[in-house]
């Protein structure tokens, strides 16, 4: 693996030196590939365009990120920003690279979660768009263009993760391929109109299974906090190592989102049928609400309190998008019945 890691560092160095003018593009691409962007940015937009596809986006995002966490616990995987210093191989001639605010994620590196979740979620969206365009226009060229744009977007997300030193190239490729396979598989079973008990059990199963697996690995002598220690040691700025990028934060986000999805469908099973203009208003209000929810600060001590509140925070997201905001807009725009 050492040779693979060396080549990855050289590629990151070359990418930073030769595309410095594209730094803003890479940072935006990395942000758009963040698993939480699938929940906070992509889900509302898709949901107000097509309800079932929006639910599929949330479902696939949660399950693919959870599986990514399990894979990382099994495969470990270094990250470039800490491996450069930890390996001791570059003491004489360190690579000319820099870290960024989004570099210092504290979980293991393989496979890339950004690549895996993004490729899974956007497969659901692009394949749905391609099916729609094929049905209404009969144009295979348009479908091909959509899949080409999908590939270009994934390429940008993957390169951005290498550029900011968050992942090695082989970790990105592994994440992209695994994500596409998950997108194809999970799209077949979208839990629309499933009972609340289904989501409650699924949410608790994700939490329970991950915690049991974590405990078993620790019992065998595997220290799963190794990556957090390395992140704190080698990140160039300590404030860039945040609890919301830790593995247990991902776990609680996924479980919270699924429980919230169940609650949203329980409160209003069929949702509201709104015309295009009210749906646009819903999107604007939801985006504003989710912006403030995502930025709401949580106490980081004790950790159990942080993770519990993090779970609740993301369980609110589907309810805001699917129930609270559409219900409010429905009340505002509904025409009074004539007697």
Swiss-Prot record:
Keywords: Endoplasmic reticulum, Gluconeogenesis, Hydrolase, Membrane, Transmembrane, Transmembrane helix
Catalytic activity: D-glucose 6-phosphate + H2O = D-glucose + phosphate
Secretion signal, residue range per the UniProt entry: none
Localization (cell): Endoplasmic reticulum membrane
Record-annotated disulphide pairs: none
Function, as annotated: Hydrolyzes glucose-6-phosphate to glucose in the endoplasmic reticulum. May be responsible for glucose production through glycogenolysis and gluconeogenesis.
Official protein name in the record: Glucose-6-phosphatase 3
Species classification: Eukaryota, Metazoa, Chordata, Craniata, Vertebrata
